[in-house]
């Protein structure tokens, strides 16, 4: 209500505007000039520390800030992930560490439908009838695949009456097998009730990212193009570690949400590393490997925040990195705007112009994609 009254979208760093209690970091007063949140995205107010001090007459000083240089998310040491996840579980949950990390965390088993789909993915002789049969054994999943194909985003002529219709007439075998796998996995862990204020809803972020990746993949030269369906799946599941963090560390997840709200200029990796000692990318990739998912998918989740990654299966994390950053720079997603370096386009063999075209097509169909996401976005 307070933000609406002043027509603001964020809490401004100007205490007199609100009657709320104010706590400020005392080291700020050692700086000659300050940049404080204005209440509008991308707009800061520059003020001298002396003038700002006069606004703090009813505020309380404290010493609680941490220099970013002391927080170092593990971007490039995947071999340390298991030990770091174990340490976080031991430190921040009441769970007693067992010999196997997966027993300690109590991760749900891979759904039966997903197990069948994984077997089909690696079967070169799999047919449309095979995937239709598997999807239709899970009525909720079948309904989701049909509604996906019926979305105005795909503009299919006539009604989509069955899973077979969705495959043959609209989506194709490769996309459906990966879409079905993504939806099946997405249901294994519930959406958390808590989330950072103003965060893009989980499935909206997932669907937009997958749609952008679909367009980017088509723009990559055929000889270096990664598997389109697997790229799409990487987009759908890129933020799966967010669900895992909420499942494994429930009380601390709320703390992460509040820290993200208080630090909109920071990536989630810094906040999670500071509070837990691990990031959603680490635990998401670990779970993909535990479930026996394709290594390309684990790499996509693990290295998606590193625009310079050029290791094994680099195209998949590079595509996620590019899609997420381009969406974020257009106001979709959470965290600060991030530069998209030219080397990222060069490594994928795609021009900046073609990437912009791909994202423009997705944003032109934003209403259709948002309607699709609405079916998934309530906690379940």
What are these regions (language model features)?
Residues 2-3, 228, 295-299, 350-359:
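Short, surface-exposed acidic
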Residues 2-9, 70-71, 302-306, 358-363:
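Short linear loop/turn motifs
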Residues 9-10, 54, 142, 308, ...:
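A broad, structure-centric signal for solvent-exposed, well-ordered loop/edge residues
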Residues 43-56, 209, 269-279, 342-351:
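Short secondary-structure transition/capping segments
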Residues 51-71, 213, 278-286, 349-362:
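A short, terminal or domain-edge coil/loop segment
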Residues 72-340, 379:
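Conserved alpha-helical "signature site"
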Residues 94, 325, 338, 342-380:
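Terminal helices and disordered tails flanking the catalytic cores of nucleotide-processing hydrolases
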């Amino acid at each position: 209500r307070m933000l609406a009254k002043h027509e603001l979208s964020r809490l401004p760093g100007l205490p007199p505007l609100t009657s709320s209690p104010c706590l400020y970091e005392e080291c700020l007063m050692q700086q000659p000039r300050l940049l404080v949140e204005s209440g509008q995205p991308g707009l800061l107010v520059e003020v001298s520390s002396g003038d700002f001090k006069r606004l703090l007459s009813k505020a309380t000083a404290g010493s609680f800030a941490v220099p970013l240089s002391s927080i170092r998310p593990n971007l490039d040491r995947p071999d340390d992930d298991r030990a770091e996840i174990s340490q976080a579980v031991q430190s921040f949950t009441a769970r007693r560490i067992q010999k196997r990390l997966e027993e300690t965390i109590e991760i749900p088993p891979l759904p039966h439908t997903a197990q069948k789909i994984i077997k089909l993915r690696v079967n070169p002789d799999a047919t449309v009838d095979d995937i239709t049969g598997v999807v239709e054994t899970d009525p909720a999943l079948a309904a989701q695949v049909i509604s996906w194909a019926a979305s105005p985003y795909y503009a299919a002529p006539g009604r989509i009456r069955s899973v077979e219709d969705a495959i043959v007439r609209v989506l194709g075998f490769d996309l459906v097998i990966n879409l079905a796998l993504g939806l099946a996995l997405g249901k294994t862990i519930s959406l958390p009730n808590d989330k950072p204020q103003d965060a893009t809803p989980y499935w909206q972020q997932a669907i937009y990212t997958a749609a952008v990746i679909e367009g980017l993949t088509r723009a990559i030269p055929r000889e270096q193009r990664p598997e389109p369906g697997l790229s799409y799946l990487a987009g759908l599941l890129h933020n799966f570690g967010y669900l895992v963090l909420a499942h494994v560390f429930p009380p601390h997840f709320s703390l992460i949400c509040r820290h993200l709200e208080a630090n909109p200029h920071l990536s989630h990796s810094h906040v999670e590393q500071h509070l837990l000692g691990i990031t959603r990318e680490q635990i998401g990739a670990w779970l993909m490997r535990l479930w026996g998912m394709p290594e390309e998918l684990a790499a996509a989740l693990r290295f998606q925040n590193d625009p310079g990654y050029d290791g094994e299966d680099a195209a998949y994390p590079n595509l996620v990195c590019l899609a997420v950053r381009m969406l974020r720079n257009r106001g979709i997603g959470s965290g600060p705007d991030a530069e998209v370096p030219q080397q990222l386009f060069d490594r994928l063999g795609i021009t900046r112009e073609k990437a912009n075209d791909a994202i423009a097509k997705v944003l032109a169909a934003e209403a259709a994609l948002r309607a699709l996401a609405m079916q998934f976005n309530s906690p379940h």
